[in-house]
C-alpha cells in the first residue's frame, strides 16, 4: 500500500520511524504532510529521509522548526504557516529556498521573513495569503515590491496595503497581470484613524487591472462613499465591460446604509457587477471564495 497523505497528531511523542520500520516504501510517494512542530524532532528528520516527494506541508507551530527540516522539502508546492501568537523570530524561513513553491498561506508570520521567503522562490507562486500580522510602512512596501518582482504568475493575493503604499498597487497590477482574485485589507482595519482615499484606489484598479482580474474583496473599517463606488463601476464598465465583477466587502463594525446596496444593485442590473456579498466578519467567506 502506498500512502499519499499523512496527518501526525499534536504531542505525538513516539518515534515514528520505529512504528513504520519495514514498511518505509509505503511512504515513498507521500505528497501531503500535516503535523505539529512540537513532535519528536527525530520523527521529522526521519520523514525527510524517506519522503522526498512531499509537495504540500502544513505545520502547526508551537516551536520553531529548523531550517534543515524545511529546506529538505525541495519539491514543496504548498506551504501553510500559522503562528498561534507566541513571539518567535521565524528566522528559520530567512534564506530558505523553495524553488517550486506555488501556494503560500501565512497567518501571524513576520513580514520580514515572508519577504525573504518570497524573494527566494523561482516565479512559480500563484497564490499568496498573508494576514493577521502588524507591520510598518517600510516592511509593507518591501513585501509588495517583492511580490510584483518575483511572482509574475500570481493569480490570487490577500495582503494588507498600508495607505502610504497604495501607489504600489499600480505596479503590482501591471507586473502580476495574471491576477484573477485580489483581496485587499485596508489600513483602517488596524488603525481606525486612517482615512482611505478610495478615489485613488479605485482609479488604480480600473485603469490597470488586466482582463483576467474580476474577483475583488475589500476588508475595511469605513466604507467608501457612494460617489467613489460610482466612479469605480463606471470606469470598470468603460475599460473592462466584458468582465463583470464578483465583489465581496467585509466591514469592521460599521454597517452600510441601504443606499450603498441600492447603488450596487443598480450596477448588477447593468451587468457591471455579477455578484455582491457583504459581511461583518472575515471568517464568513473562505479567503479566495467568491
Where do the model's predicted regions map?
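The conserved beta-strand core of Leucine-Rich Repeat
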Residues: 1-290
Amino acid at each position: 500500500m502506498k500512502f499519499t497523505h499523512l496527518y501526525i497528531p499534536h504531542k505525538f511523542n513516539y518515534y515514528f520511524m520505529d512504528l513504520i520500520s519495514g514498511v518505509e516504501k509505503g511512504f515513498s510517494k507521500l505528497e501531503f504532510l500535516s503535523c505539529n512542530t512540537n513532535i519528536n524532532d527525530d520523527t521529522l528528520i526521519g520523514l525527510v529521509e524517506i519522503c522526498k516527494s512531499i509537495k504540500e506541508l502544513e505545520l502547526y507551530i508551537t516551536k520553531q522548526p529548523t531550517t534543515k527540516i524545511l529546506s529538505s522539502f525541495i519539491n514543496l508546492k504548498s506551504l501553510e504557516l500559522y503562528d498561534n501568537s507566541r513571539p518567535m523570530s521565524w528566522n528559520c524561513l530567512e534564506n530558505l529556498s523553495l524553488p517550486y513553491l506555488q501556494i503560500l498561506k501565512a497567518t501571524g508570520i513576520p513580514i520580514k521573513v515572508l519577504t525573504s521567503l518570497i524573494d527566494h522562490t523561482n516565479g512559480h507562486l500563484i497564490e499568496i495569503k498573508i494576514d493577521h500580522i502588524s507591520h510598518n510602512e517600510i516592511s509593507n512596501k518591501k513585501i509588495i515590491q517583492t511580490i510584483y518582482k518575483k511572482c509574475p504568475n500570481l493569480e490570487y493575493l490577500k495582503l494588507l496595503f498600508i495607505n502610504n503604499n497604495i501607489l504600489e498597487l499600480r505596479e503590482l497590477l501591471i507586473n502580476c497581470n495574471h491576477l484573477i482574485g485580489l483581496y485587499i485589507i485596508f489600513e483602517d482595519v488596524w488603525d481606525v484613524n486612517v482615512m482611505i482615499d478610495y478615489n485613488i484606489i479605485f482609479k488604480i484598479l480600473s485603469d490597470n487591472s488586466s482582463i483576467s482580474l474580476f474577483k475583488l474583496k475589500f476588508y475595511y473599517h469605513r466604507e467608501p462613499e457612494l460617489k467613489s463606488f460610482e466612479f469605480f463601476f463606471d470606469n470598470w464598465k468603460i475599460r473592462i465591460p466584458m468582465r463583470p465583477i464578483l465583489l465581496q466587502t467585509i466591514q469592521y463594525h460599521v454597517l452600510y446604509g441601504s443606499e450603498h446596496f441600492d447603488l450596487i444593485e443598480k450596477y448588477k442590473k447593468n451587468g457591471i457587477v455579477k455578484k455582491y456579498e457583504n459581511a461583518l466578519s472575515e471568517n464568513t467567506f473562505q479567503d479566495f471564495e467568491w
